[in-house]
């Protein structure tokens, strides 16, 4: 008696495109990155069972995408994403804030927060190559979209697997912020309503991690993660994470979320973990600094290629994220002033939406 062994089919369909040549392709890429990132966060933090996800590939990295018909919670998040996409298509969406909290009656008191900032361009991003005397030498269009997308997803997976566990029972919330100068005051995405509360509070001292940015000729998306400091497991023994005794997180006029220490005790230092590609940034900022791309950012990098190639089938220990660690009752505030002016006599309300 002979047996025929069936080989597992090779995944040929990739989620992300190789080339982005028009605005529609760019829009699809940003939508997919949002869906991948938010689905990956819920999967790697153990918020839903594995049956709630379908499997896709980003390069050689297997990712888990929420399926709308799998469970009510997954269906709700998919509906949130559809609301995000509506605002994104209209070029209204400025930022998506995905927060994790423990008290169902107090969604402003969070334990973890993920920020996705969106920008739109007309002629496509350009990067300047400058000489030592500051003179611009040349310009070229950014065309490394797929590689930067793969690296951003990989960084997210590596970070999620090195974070300490969440409490047993947690909830999700989403806030949407807009470009107020172009967004009609009456506009609300499907499934969202206006939010009157502009403050988030952390139970323990938070730390911000800058994950990275993906740039296309028509959009850019930047991702940051804010979590409790003691939840971060160091990648290296000599890594220092800059902290302060009390934090405020503000949204400036251009939508940049800047962190400041009330007691001015934060070290103005950046620590870059080269192996994981994750930047721990705690430098005090009051406004967004323009990011200057260097030639190395977009040139062929063997080390970067190696990081992408060795990321297939990262294993996840779901129990690690659900162990119910007990937190001390320390409070840190993240304040989101709804003002577009530095010191207005009567503050203007910045438009913010939350799910209905």
Swiss-Prot record:
InterPro entries: HORMA_dom, HORMA_dom_sf, HORMA_MeioticProgression. The keyword Acetylation does not apply. One of its GO terms (cellular component) is chromosome. Residues 24-225 form the HORMA domain. Its main location: nucleus. It is found in: Nucleus; Chromosome. Keywords: Chromosome, Differentiation, Meiosis, Nucleus, Oogenesis, Spermatogenesis. GO terms for biological process: meiotic cell cycle; meiotic DNA double-strand break formation; meiotic recombination checkpoint signaling; meiotic sister chromatid cohesion; oogenesis; regulation of homologous chromosome segregation; spermatogenesis; synaptonemal complex assembly. Residues 288-298 have a biased composition (Basic and acidic residues). Residues 282-305, 333-356 are annotated as: Disordered. Residues 347-356 have a biased composition (Basic residues). It comes from the Eukaryota. The keyword Protein biosynthesis does not apply. Gene3D superfamilies: HORMA domain. Pfam families: HORMA. PANTHER family: HORMA DOMAIN-CONTAINING PROTEIN 1 (PTHR48225:SF3). Plays a key role in meiotic progression by ensuring that sufficient numbers of processed DNA double-strand breaks (DSBs) are available for successful homology search, promoting synaptonemal-complex formation independently and playing key role in the male mid-pachytene checkpoint and the female meiotic prophase checkpoint. This is HORMA domain-containing protein 1. The lineage of its organism: Eukaryota, Metazoa, Chordata, Craniata, Vertebrata.
């Amino acid at each position: 008696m002979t047996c025929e062994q069936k080989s597992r089919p090779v995944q040929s369909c990739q989620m992300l495109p190789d080339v982005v040549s028009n605005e529609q392709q760019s829009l699809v890429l940003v939508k997919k990155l949002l869906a991948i990132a938010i689905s990956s966060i819920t999967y790697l933090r153990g918020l839903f069972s594995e049956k709630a996800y379908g499997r896709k590939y980003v390069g050689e990295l297997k990712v888990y995408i929420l399926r709308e018909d799998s469970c009510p919670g997954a269906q709700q998040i998919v509906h949130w994403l559809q609301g995000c996409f509506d605002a994104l298509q209209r070029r209204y969406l400025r930022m998506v804030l995905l927060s994790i909290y423990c008290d169902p009656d107090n969604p402003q008191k969070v334990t973890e927060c993920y920020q996705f900032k969106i920008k739109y361009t007309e002629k496509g991003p350009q990067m300047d190559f400058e000489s030592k005397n500051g003179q611009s030498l040349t310009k070229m269009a950014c065309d490394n979209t797929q590689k930067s997308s793969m690296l951003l997803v990989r960084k997210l997976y590596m970070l999620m697997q090195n974070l300490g566990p969440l409490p047993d029972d947690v909830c999700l919330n989403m806030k949407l912020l807009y470009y107020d100068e172009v967004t009609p005051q009456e506009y609300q995405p499907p499934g969202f309503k206006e939010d009157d509360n502009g403050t988030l509070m952390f139970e323990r001292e938070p730390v911000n991690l800058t994950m990275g940015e993906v740039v296309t000729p028509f959009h850019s998306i930047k991702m940051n993660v804010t979590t409790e400091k003691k939840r971060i497991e160091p990648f290296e023994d000599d890594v220092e994470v800059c902290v302060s005794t009390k934090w405020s997180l503000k949204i400036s006029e251009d939508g940049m979320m800047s962190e400041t220490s009330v007691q001015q005790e934060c070290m103005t230092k950046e620590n870059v973990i080269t192996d994981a590609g994750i930047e721990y940034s705690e430098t005090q900022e009051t406004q967004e600094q323009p990011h200057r791309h260097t030639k190395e950012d977009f040139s062929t990098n063997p080390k970067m290629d190696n990081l992408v190639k060795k990321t297939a089938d990262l294993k996840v220990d779901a129990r690690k994220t659900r162990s119910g660690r007990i937190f001390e009752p320390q409070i840190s505030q993240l304040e989101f002033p709804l003002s577009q002016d530095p010191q207005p006599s009567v503050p203007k309300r910045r438009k913010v939406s939350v799910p209905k």
